[in-house]
Amino acid sequence: MKKNKIVFIFGPTAVGKSDILFNFPKGIAEVINVDSIQVYKEFDIASCKPSVELRSHIKHHLVDFLEPIEEYNLGVFYKEASKIIKNLRDQDKLPVFVGGSAFYFKHLQYGLPSTPPVSSEIRFYVNSLFTTRGKDYLLEELKRVDFERYESISENDIYRIRRSLEVYYQTGIPISQFLKKGQMIEDVLAIGLKRPMEEMRSRIISRVGNMIDCGLLEEIKSLLGKGYDETTPAFKGIGYREFLLWKSRPYSMLNDIIDLIVKNSFLYVKRQMTFFDKIPNVLWFHPDDDLRDILDLIFV
């Protein structure tokens, strides 16, 4: 197995990514989750988190590590993933990124976008800090969150000081990391999984039915009872957000909610495949028919 290789295994929701991992040999690789909802504690069933059995077979990172009220974005993912890659390489273990968030895969391999957009709320917040606490406070804050940037700009360059803090508060990543060049990961084995769309539709219907059988309704009631609502970042996931309609319209039939989850899931699959098809140098497989070829590619 080639040293310093990184493996991507991606594909749409319900394609069967987790099933392949049960066939991995123990102790050689660890999985880094590339999903924006499985990161949250308590949101278990509709997010289709890897099972206890799978996580005992192969270690998973970036699962169940955030509170539901915390924001998760590309910046947090990139920062955490970069640390995990280094740690696994130090242990001579293979990093295997598995999930369906194409945007995260793209920027992990090709680097972060050159300075990301910042919301008007963040700009207002930084401006209020400048107005109420002054330039010296902003300088100390920049020194704390991005010492490299702090050392590289003039203490009188208030525009760049403010911009640097805006980017950090928006993404959780120092602007100095965005400005660096040559961060592309070269040695990536990108494996894509796909099935015919009718097969995907059937699998989604089955998966949503299994969610209900496994207690999704009870999980939703428990989450709402704890005060989580439409402002909770974790509730943006498919399978959760649809039940917010049920909360606001209790006369809605459960079957209508289930149908909406199936519809939204299938539309999401189509969007995922549109994005994945644009990623170059991907080796595409059917997860059932080509399992042996996939394992040979990864571990030989």
UniProtKB/Swiss-Prot annotation:
It is an enzyme of class 2 (transferase). Keywords: ATP-binding, Magnesium, Nucleotide-binding, Transferase, tRNA processing. Pfam families: IPPT (PF01715). GO terms for biological process: tRNA modification. One of its GO terms (molecular function) is tRNA dimethylallyltransferase activity. The record marks 101, 123 as: Interaction with substrate tRNA. This is tRNA dimethylallyltransferase. It comes from Borrelia turicatae (strain 91E135). The lineage of its organism: Bacteria, Pseudomonadati, Spirochaetota, Spirochaetia, Spirochaetales.
